[in-house]
Amino acid sequence: MALKIKIPETSQSSDEYSRWTVYHIEVAFPNGGKHVVFRRFNEFVALDAQIRPNDYNSRLCKLPSKSWVSSTVTNEKLRESRRLALQAYVQCLSETPWIKMPVVKKFLNIKDESEDETQGQFLGPTDWIQVFQDCKRNLHMYRVDLMSGKSITIGVQTKNVYAIKSLMDNLSESLDKLELANALGPGEILRRKDMLEQLGSEFLSFKRLVKNANSPVAPPSASSQLNSSNPSSPFRPLSASTDKQSNTSLNRVLGKNRMPETQTTKKLDNVGLYNMQNQTMEDQDMQAESLLPIIQRQKELSKMINQEVVEQNSMLDELSNEAYANQKKLHRTRAGLRKLG
């Protein structure tokens, strides 16, 4: 079982009593599949206590010692050094005989037939974004091919629909697991759910396009075309009322709401309108991406400010304790002076 195990990143989690560091263990299988397991440091300690007695030749890496002075929540250097030490530890676990132990398999969330497991791969926070972008890119490409009239068989179109649906299901399941594991903040979870909802709307639109493209269209009969009483007949006499009805029926609808025609859209057919909408959305995406570095910088500043506030609170607590101790000493000194006086 040639596994590649690493700890690429960490995150913070908390409850009403304390905060702690969560280590993201990424397990990659030989077939290309991978998943992420979230563990705390005390879970590493519990695992080591179970398997350390079996280390007769001292081949297993040692766990980093627990620090009673500083915390990985506030000390970034300590958190990084512990991450590297734990990464070396889990890489030792990928070797025989440790990887064959049931307790290690349970710790790494590895099933007995993990080499053949290719479905339902759990995505970490970074992989989730990459798969989402690939899914959106593929959906856009399939839709452009369909709208441009390329000769694509029904089987290929159906395969594309199921491929996108499978990726979206995996994204949804992985996001639920990330939320349960507190691997992402509530704001980021909500943002990614909105991204999935928007992608789902685009997917439903693509499914309707595939269905309409594959459904046979009955040709109009000659009698209906030549019948002047038919409202759509080209031989029907024009009048004010009929012209108004025809204009209303021939308005193109893009999306849910009916948009008024402009000088630009009147010159375009359906494919041109679709390409124009895509170009508009790409421009909006570029504007959003240009704002991303600013938002990330603000996030980093917020984290630095939060860390500074935590350190200042700790210093104030120490100062308060020292002031309380000095006050007690002062009371004792005054009491002694009263006895002497």
Swiss-Prot record:
Function statement: Essential for proper morphogenesis of the vacuole. May exist as structural reinforcement on the surface of the vacuolar membrane and be required for maintenance against rupture by osmotic pressure.
All copies of domain t-SNARE coiled-coil homology, residue ranges: 278-340
Gene Ontology CC: one annotated term: endomembrane system
Protein name from the UniProt record: Vacuolar morphogenesis protein 7 homolog
Localization terms from the record: Vacuole
Residue ranges of domain PX in the record: 1-115
Main location: other
